[in-house]
Amino acid sequence: MTHEPLVQFQNVQLGYGRQVVLQNVQLDIFRGDFFGLVGPNGSGKTTLLRCLLGILKPLRGQVARAEGLRIGYVPQREMLDPLFPLTALDIVLMGRYPHAGIFRSPRRNDRELAMQCLEQVGLADSAHKLYRELSGGQRQRVLIARALAVEPNLLVLDEPTNGLDLPTEAAILGFIERLHQHDGLTIVLVSHVLNVVARYASRMGVLLDGRLLVGDAEQLIQEQVLEEAYGVPVCVQRLDHHYLVAVREVERADGDG
């Protein structure tokens, strides 16, 4: 990680109309970061993500983006009508639209790059299979390939392992980690699953009562912070340089069934 900021939130207030969701957001995403954003459902993760992507404007404050910033975005799920006979390659080619334009046919170099992205995620052999016929893990890899086709310097993933089985989840997260470590790609990983972010992120943000707490994982993966954010007693353990977070069992009073 360098100290070159790709995105800077400066005293930002976010919300919808008169409803304020987050306030006084101070956040720098640096080149080479692996930044994890966590918080319970309804805490404002989607709102902050929409602002990061440029979809939602701040109510107050400023969001500064580095010149030449290209964001590849992997959504939770792709809402495609199953009647559309789109192949995996068709989906990945969508990532070329910012470069080529929506109404222009993909050029040879666009197709070559899309195939390279599919190969990168291990799905070159499935390029011409219908997207709707792929497994959940394969679909997620296709969405990552589409984001890589943007040729991003910042990759944003929203709940990338939601609904996947454990082996597929581990494979997807391992691939994301390799993109960061070997390719030097800056990562923002959004998840409600603490253990996912705790294992991979070097810096993180925790959403708490309309505020964003930012720091190193070691600073924020503390029982007091997480209990306040999630409203349940937790236990934090560190194993092999990784954190394990679990809900603490509460002793029942005598006579409770």
Segments and roles (model prediction):
Residues 93, 108-126:
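Conserved ABC ATPase "signature" region
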Residues 151:
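Conserved catalytic motifs of ABC-family nucleotide-binding domains
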Residues 191-192:
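H-loop/switch region of ABC-family ATPase nucleotide-binding domains
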Residues 229-257:
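ABC ATPase nucleotide-binding domains
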